[in-house]
From Swiss-Prot:
GO biological process, one term: sphingolipid metabolic process
Keyword check for Secreted: no
Family as reported in the entry's similarity comment: Belongs to the ARV1 family.
Gene name of this polypeptide: ARV2
Name this protein carries in UniProt: Protein ARV 2
Length: 228
């Protein structure tokens, strides 16, 4: 079996290896033959440093995560994909519940079962529209890799949604939800740029179109549910 190649986080060029390990805890980082920089400085960084650079939307951090951490050619990637889909839908459901509770205040007249069903329908319909519109816009505007790789990229780069869990703790205003939504959009665009090597403007346009359609479908679905 051929050894899997890694990617230089500086220029995106393929490299044979990221480091040479001489003994446990003793290794040397390799340089990229193309740009002559250290291929992946994040190998020896703490997870917190990587997370901060992801929040800052550094392309180096996204290359490290998408190419050198996640092995998209692995047989286990399908298992990872299903886990990410579930986590993404759960976070989106939590977002919808936060918005609903904020807008409805203390209204508890709606049964829990009906409310849960309505939220589930809203989340599934909005995300179906998001994936469909994203795939359509990307096909028109970008050089597309495989669909599975793009889906994995979007799911991973939506990690910003985890900040929604901080809202009930610190009692943030509802506007924070929309700030998180904007961060998810820009994070998706950076990850898409890394995966497709397309212009930033095109990647932003694709993500803006997909997120806008998702927002519209979510609003329409929520309105239909409220009048039923």
């Amino acid at each position: 079996m051929a050894r899997e190649k890694k990617t230089c986080v500086e220029c995106g060029h393929k490299v044979k290896s990221l480091f040479i390990q001489y003994s446990p805890g003793n290794f040397r980082l390799m340089k990229c033959e193309n740009c002559e920089e250290v291929a992946d400085e994040y190998v020896e960084c703490e997870l917190l440093i990587i997370f901060i650079d992801l929040i800052l939307h550094k392309t180096k951090a996204y290359r490290h995560l998408l190419y050198n951490v996640v092995n998209q050619e692995s047989a286990n990637v399908q298992h990872l994909l299903w886990k990410l889909v579930l986590a993404y839908l759960l976070l989106d459901t939590y977002r919808s519940l936060l918005l609903r509770r904020t807008n409805d205040g203390s209204n508890v007249s709606m049964s829990f079962l009906f409310e849960s069903l309505e939220v589930l329908v809203n989340v599934l319909s909005a995300n179906f529209a998001f994936v469909f519109s994203f795939a359509f816009a990307a096909k028109l505007m970008l050089v597309m890799p495989r669909g599975k790789e793009i889906l994995l990229t979007i799911l991973i780069s939506s990690y910003v949604k985890i900040f929604l869990f901080a809202m009930p703790v610190w009692e943030f205003p509802v506007s924070v939800i929309f700030i998180v939504d904007m961060l998810v959009l820009t994070s998706n665009a950076v990850a898409l740029k890394v995966m497709t090597e397309s212009a930033t403007s095109r990647c932003l346009a694709v993500c803006f179109i997909a997120h806008s359609i998702r927002f519209l479908v979510d609003q329409i679905s929520g309105h239909l549910g409220s009048v039923m």
